[in-house]
Structures are given as C-alpha cells and as structure tokens.
Amino acid sequence: MKSRQGISSCWHNKLQGALFLSAFLTWGLGDAVTSLWMIEHRGITGEANLIAQYMITNYGASSFIAMKIWFTTIVLFFIPFLIQKRSEQPVYWMINGYYLSFFVAGVLAMILNMQAALNEALLLQPEQVIFLFLSLIFILTSVGEEVDKRTNPRIGNYFDCFLSDIAKVLTFITNRN
C-alpha cells in the first residue's frame, strides 16, 4: 500500500495493534490469571472486585476467565471500532491513549495481585489504581484527540496492511528455500 509520499507504511496500524495486544494481555488475561493466583493464596475475600468474587464463587474460575476475555474484547475492540466508524474526524491517537490507559491499569492490577498473593505491602490501594485508570483514560484520550486534530493522521486500511504483512512473510519464507 502506497502513501501520498510513495512510501509503503503500516506503522500506525502496527503501533495500534501492539497497544491493543498489550492492553488485552495485561488488563484482560494478566489481571484474570494473577487474580486467580492471588485468590488461591489468600482466598476469595482477597479479590477487591465484587463481580469477580461473585463469578468465581458461583460459576468457577474458567467462567471468570471466559467472562473477562469476553468483556475485554468488547471494551478494547468493539468500543474503539464504533468510535472510529462514527467519527468524522481522525481518532487514531485518541484510541491509542485509550489502549495505553488499559495497559497501565492491567500492569498495576497484575502487580497488586502478585503483591497480595505474596503478602507484601501493596504499591497502591485498589481504589488508587481505579482513580489513576480513570484519570489516564480522560487525560490520554484528550491528549490523543488534540494530537489527532493537529496532525490529521492518515491511517491505512487494517486489512490491506494485514495482507501486505502476510505477503512479506510468505515472500521471506519462499526466498529462504
């Protein structure tokens, strides 16, 4: 895919994909797995999230992980997708700020879960992490929105970039033999 300068680039797509994957792995999977590990060591009352407590107590750990993956997919994929589809203006950097907020929250949640499981002093209280997370969403999406207004980024089609990457991998594989 060629841009206006004649340079083939999908780095915007790769950056956003990496941020999405990082947020999914930390806020979605990492938090769920470390929560279960912490509950194994401290008991169900160690979990600060009442919804997670209810899910694990009544439906088991596998249902909790399935629910967390489902909810994470909706929050990280469908909400930004709807924002991009409905927006007249570019929202690339705004969505990157959104993903970065979830990544930071996921890392902090994992750290707190591991500290609680090991009976260590907590870096932050869960309420502080939630406040920080909500603040980051507000700040980073606002900054991203302003950057989008000033730079007007031209983002390539995700599917075209994906096909281009597949073609590069296949070319590399066939040229090796």
Ranges and model annotations:
Residues 2-177:
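Hydrophobic alpha-helical segments at protein termini of multi-pass membrane proteins
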